[in-house]
Amino acid sequence: MASSTSTTTSKEIDRELPPLLRVYKDGTVERFLGSSFVPPSPEDPETGVSTKDIVISENPTISARVYLPKLNNTTEKLPILVYYHGGAFCLESAFSFLHQRYLNIVASKANVLVVSIEYRLAPEHPLPAAYEDGWYALKWVTSHSTNNNKPTNADPWLIKHGDFNRFYIGGDTSGANIAHNAALRVGAEALPGGLRIAGVLSAFPLFWGSKPVLSEPVEGHEKSSPMQVWNFVYPDAPGGIDNPLINPLAPGAPNLATLGCPKMLVFVAGKDDLRDRGIWYYEAVKESGWKGDVELAQYEGEEHCFQIYHPETENSKDLIGRIASFLV
């Protein structure tokens, strides 16, 4: 749990990940970035979207915020988007102000039912906890698609308004990484009811590796921010930064041709340190022999996750419009 600076200045530091967070010897975690938590709303005044929080699992603790846009009629069926928030596996939340504001807009503009997953964060819960939570939550949501295997804590919005023939997953940055690995797992394992993913939305995906790609600088690569983040959130990762979870082309990584979806949309931003890695990922998927369609949308002059921080700009509106066109 994060503590205020005033109560931690005298504590002994165990380790830290500047400028994101610090861990103290007593186990206290102090986070320096990330937006404040906000409650769900029966009706957002800007978009008319209704939100509520649900419990998916009590052990481990996995929950979600569900977004339901204004309905044309009480029996309307909507596409479903299971969304994994970003934050370097150690920051942010499905209940944060930034993601609440952003997903209200996405749900409204795309007319989609969004299930935003609250997975466990590092360092309290080092990876692969977030991947395990993401997969558990995905199976829980898809179990609503069949009458025989509905969970005991089934959600009425999903049952009444979810169209499981239009079922998508996606996320931003580390959340896009979780979505990618979930899509690979879907290609190898069956979801409840044999459900298939209609597409994957990958916004500024967090991938990395021991060798620079494209125009990534060679000098300083070993001390790059993504490498420091990965070593912090998954210190025991087999293969380190070339673990297949973070490097999809690492030795032993699953073949990208096995991605369990028919289409993918990848976003990159010109001023983002992850730009080249996102383009590299797009090219790798396209050349893998995968039978699906992958599209790349580039926003030159924009920063990492600009659409979340500044959803009012023209480029953000364009990006959200592309999402709406993708989620059909």
Curated annotation (Swiss-Prot):
Matches recorded under SUPFAM superfamilies: alpha/beta-Hydrolases
Domain of life, source organism: Eukaryota
Catalysed reactions, as listed in the record: (2R,3S)-2,4',7-trihydroxyisoflavanone = daidzein + H2O + H(+); 2-hydroxy-2,3-dihydrogenistein = genistein + H2O + H(+); a carboxylic ester + H2O = an alcohol + a carboxylate + H(+)
UniProt keyword Phosphoprotein present: no
Active site (UniProt): T173, D272, H304
InterPro entries recorded: AB_hydrolase_3, AB_hydrolase_fold, Carboxylest/Gibb_receptor
One GO biological process term: flavonoid biosynthetic process
Gene Ontology MF term list: 2-hydroxyisoflavanone dehydratase activity; carboxylesterase activity
Motif (Involved in the stabilization of the negatively charged intermediate by the formation of the oxyanion hole): 85-87
Enzyme Commission code: 3.1.1.1, 4.2.1.105
Entry keyword set: Flavonoid biosynthesis, Hydrolase, Lyase
Biological or metabolic pathway of the protein: Secondary metabolite biosynthesis; flavonoid biosynthesis
Lyase listed as a keyword: yes
TM annotation in the entry: none
Stated family: Belongs to the 'GDXG' lipolytic enzyme family.
Role noted for this protein: Dehydratase that mediates the biosynthesis of isoflavonoids. Can better use 2,7-dihydroxy-4'-methoxyisoflavanone as substrate. Has also a slight carboxylesterase activity toward p-nitrophenyl butyrate.
Cross-referenced PANTHER family: 2-HYDROXYISOFLAVANONE DEHYDRATASE, ARYLACETAMIDE DEACETYLASE
Protein name: 2-hydroxyisoflavanone dehydratase
